[in-house]
Amino acid sequence: MNPQIRNPMERMYRDTFYDNFENEPILYGRSYTWLCYEVKIKRGRSNLLWDTGVFRGQVYFKPQYHAEMCFLSWFCGNQLPAYKCFQITWFVSWTPCPDCVAKLAEFLSEHPNVTLTISAARLYYYWERDYRRALCRLSQAGARVTIMDYEEFAYCWENFVYNEGQQFMPWYKFDENYAFLHRTLKEILRYLMDPDTFTFNFNNDPLVLRRRQTYLCYEVERLDNGTWVLMDQHMGFLCNEAKNLLCGFYGRHAELRFLDLVPSLQLDPAQIYRVTWFISWSPCFSWGCAGEVRAFLQENTHVRLRIFAARIYDYDPLYKEALQMLRDAGAQVSIMTYDEFEYCWDTFVYRQGCPFQPWDGLEEHSQALSGRLRAILQNQGN
């Protein structure tokens, strides 16, 4: 193997950067993928820069020659301690191919002490189903995937290019290309959930086992002249964030992750919004989810909340109290019926045209759970 491919470079030349990082959505004649990286070590609330560099990968060769795999080989070869938490940022000329995504998902699963952010100049074969699904899988594995904006191009120019003191100059249609790629990526990642993930975790049989993860599909609507208007850019999918005790992180439930997301939605206090959650488990009490949601609704009176739950936590009086707390805060809490399951399948699942197939007992379980929830909210539950 060419050692230049396996070992990182410090920087690239100006022409190389302009030629390979141009954000034209469809670009031919580029036989290399370029990857600029930063690795930081998390220390409390700050991050210490550990290393930076550039990898060049060959596009049309076997996956082990791709830039992403060169980085993983180099990173793992350093035998870094598992008790330290690392924050990796990539600036890449193309998003990873499906083979590289599979390896990246495996790497992230085996290294809970690592977070990965990938900012790409272009989307690789974004019109092909397998490549779109690979991006969904990458995001579902925990990687943050974005499109490079002007600030990130300028940052790469300053830190990874022999720029000879010159400033970064964007090319023709730079903003137009970015807008298209950003919109396309958001559309791809909207359909984040794998079909098997949905059917496994949203099964509403109260006796199902091994469903400890909470999945939350959300959408936001704005009230316009008495009509709720869906905001397509504010739809998505979240799940619990895994704990990492080595880094002192105890995890975060999907409901709290949504509340963390709200500031980025930039909801105008002068407007009225309705947030809808389709959630595999009703919000819990022990992690403070119900209390945090109540506080959010009290502080944001311009936001309405509807919660459709596949199953409810009601085995403990405190969990029943959590449901009552949400009701008292103004949230509308209901059990998912066939209509909600089908809507989630059509809206939030990468279903490839397949219609929703209900599982045995769906309607019976929904009716029974609705009765239990109604008793709790009417203070009739034990």
UniProtKB/Swiss-Prot annotation:
Protein name: DNA dC->dU-editing enzyme APOBEC-3B
Chain ranges of the CMP/dCMP-type deaminase domain: 29-138, 210-326
CDD domains: cytidine_deaminase (cd01283)
Pfam families in UniProt: NAD2 (PF18782)
Gene Ontology MF terms in the entry: cytidine deaminase activity; RNA binding; zinc ion binding
Annotated binding of Zn(2+), by residue: H66, C97, C100, H253, C284, C289
SUBUNIT field: Homodimer. Interacts with APOBEC3G. Does not interact with APOBEC1.
SUPFAM superfamilies in the record: Cytidine deaminase-like
EC numbers on record: 3.5.4.38
InterPro entries from the UniProt entry: APOBEC/CMP_deaminase_Zn-bd, APOBEC_Cyt_Deaminase, CMP_dCMP_dom, Cytidine_deaminase-like
Notes on the domains: The CMP/dCMP deaminase domain 1 mediates RNA binding, RNA-dependent oligomerization and virion incorporation whereas the CMP/dCMP deaminase domain 2 confers deoxycytidine deaminase activity and substrate sequence specificity.
PROSITE patterns in UniProt: CYT_DCMP_DEAMINASES_1, CYT_DCMP_DEAMINASES_2
Organism of origin: Homo sapiens
Lineage summary: Eukaryota, Metazoa, Chordata, Craniata, Vertebrata
Gene from which this protein is expressed: APOBEC3B
